[in-house]
Amino acid sequence: DNLTLDNLKVDTNRDGFDIDCCKNVRISRCSVNTPWDDAIVLKSSYALGYFKDTENVTISDCFVSGYDRGSMLCGTWELDEPQAPDHGYRTGRIKLGTESSGGFKNITVTNCIFEHCRGLALETVDGGHLEDIEISHITMRHIVNAGIFLRLGARMRSPEGTPAGSMKRIRISHINAYDVD
C-alpha cells in the first residue's frame, strides 16, 4: 500500500510492474518494455488468503511497449526477436486482471502511450469486481491482437462458492489508435 513508482525504465521479458492487492498506488512517467509479458499489470489475487481489492491506483504519463528485450534501454528499438513462445504476438500492455479474486476500484489510466504491443485489457475472471475505472487520453500505435479487451469470465481461482465478478462504471474516452490488428 501507498506505493509510488515514478520515472523508472524497465526492459524485461517478464511482467514489468506487477501490483497485487494494493491501495493508494501512483505509477507515473515510467517506460516499460516487455515483449513477452505485461508491462504494467494490476492484480487482486487470493494470495493473502483473503479477498483484498486493488484500489485507488493512478497510472499516468507512461510508455509501454513490446520491442525486443533490451532494445529500449540501448535505444535501438528493435523488432527482430521471435515472438513469445506461448503466443504469436507481442505483449507489453497495461492490464487489470486476470488474477481478480478481490477486484479493482477507483483505477485511472491517463496520458499513456502503447507501442508495438497488445492494447489495454480489463479482465475479471475469478469473482472480483471492476468498478469506477477511468481510461482517457491514450495513444496506441502498431497494436496487435486487440486494442481494447474487456473480459468478464468464470475461471474462478477463488474459494469455492465465490460468485461471478462484475463490471460497473467503466469509462473509456479519448483513445487515438493507429495500425491496430
Which residue stretches match the model-derived regions?
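Extracellular/periplasmic carbohydrate-active domains that bind, remodel
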Residues: 1-181
